[in-house]
A protein has these predicted regions:
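The conserved catalytic core of RNA pseudouridine synthases
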Residues: 40-42, 58, 62, 152-184, ...
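A structural signal for short, well-ordered beta-strand segments
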Residues: 84-86, 165, 177, 207, ...
Length: 318
């Protein structure tokens, strides 16, 4: 049947929703499957997720609704924080516990001090080669599809930054650490690198995302909680953060009535702000208009992404 959503609901019954839900994605579910279940509960016309999580991983997955999807790409550049458990002594094809064991090695005796020294050597900017089991493309095909066919191709290294790698627990051949890293970092590769620095091999046994950009786990809702409220749209909407919540670290520029009108027409205006920076734009009364960019000298503002329809929902919940 034509024009139905993922749950079989006619498109006419879907509604406009604007805002951001901080979902606690459960293990064993793809990010897209989680997105579709949330979208179905909200009966939302438009939704997308920011910062995909592997099925094995759990934790913070921001779901952007409506016009908030226009700003979701900006969150992809944000730093992320993970709680990871690494199992030493076995390397798998996928770099996590879902893959076949392809190498075993003895685990040398170690204490917390030796683990911290090895971890310190991985902190900072570095070149990281993405794993074959990843969603990156080569020749139009996903790398993980090639890997499943037994094909391995050369992957260009990517520059990433490990801001912090902190040991939380050492229990025999298992290490638990907190990782704060830049976009594009593969924690599975980092786990293998740390195991190698400790004189053995290893893989990710569990992974949980704790934070992404300005968001942390304190405001997350579980999938079960969301679906339990599906009969009460008002209660569901009360879980939403305003659309500009994901831009909290971006400088803000306040515009007057005349400047607001010009910006909404796509025209640059005179305004003071940090030179060369992207900024949040607000009109009279503090309504969120979208994202703009200041010129190098910081005296003119050009609109980048107009999100004026979001203004009405900016008061959903701070």
């Amino acid at each position: 049947m034509k024009d139905r959503d993922a749950g079989g609901r006619p498109a006419a019954l879907r509604r406009p929703v604007d805002g951001i839900l901080l979902l606690d994605k459960p293990e064993g579910l793809t990010s897209n499957a989680a997105l579709q279940r949330v979208r179905r509960a909200y009966r939302a016309r438009k939704a997308g997720h920011t910062g995909s999580l592997d099925p094995l991983a759990s934790g913070l997955l921001p779901i952007c609704f409506g016009q908030a999807t226009k700003a979701s790409g900006l969150l992809l550049d944000a730093d992320k924080t993970y709680d990871v458990t690494i199992a030493l002594g076995e390397r798998t094809a996928t770099g996590d516990s879902e893959g076949e064991v392809v190498e075993r090695a003895p685990v040398p005796a170690m204490d917390a001090a030796s683990v911290r020294r090895a971890a310190a050597g991985l902190v900072g900017e570095q070149e990281q080669v993405p794993p074959m089991y990843s969603a990156l493309k080569h020749g139009g095909q996903r790398l993980y599809r090639l890997a499943r066919q037994g094909v391995e191709v050369e992957r260009a290294p990517r520059r990433v930054t490990i801001h912090e790698l902190r040991l939380l627990d050492l229990d025999g051949p298992r290490l638990r650490l907190e990782v704060r890293c830049s976009k594009g970092t593969y924690v599975r590769t980092l786990a293998e690198d740390l195991a190698r620095a400790l004189g053995t091999v290893g893989h990710v046994a569990s992974l949980r995302r704790l934070a992404l950009g300005p968001f942390d786990g304190r405001q997350m809702s579980t999938l079960a909680e969301v679906e339990a409220l599906s009969a009460s749209l008002a209660d569901l909407d009360a879980l939403l953060l305003p659309p500009d919540a994901g831009l909290a670290t971006m400088p803000a520029v306040q515009l007057g009535v005349a400047e607001e009108a010009l910006v909404l027409q796509g025209q640059a205006v005179f305004a003071a702000g940090p030179g060369g920076s992207k900024v949040r734009m607000y009109g009279p009364g503090g309504r969120f208009l979208g994202v703009g960019r200041m010129t190098a000298e910081g005296r003119r503002l050009a609109p980048d992404r107009i999100m004026v329809e979001l203004a009405a929902s900016a008061s959903v919940r701070a």
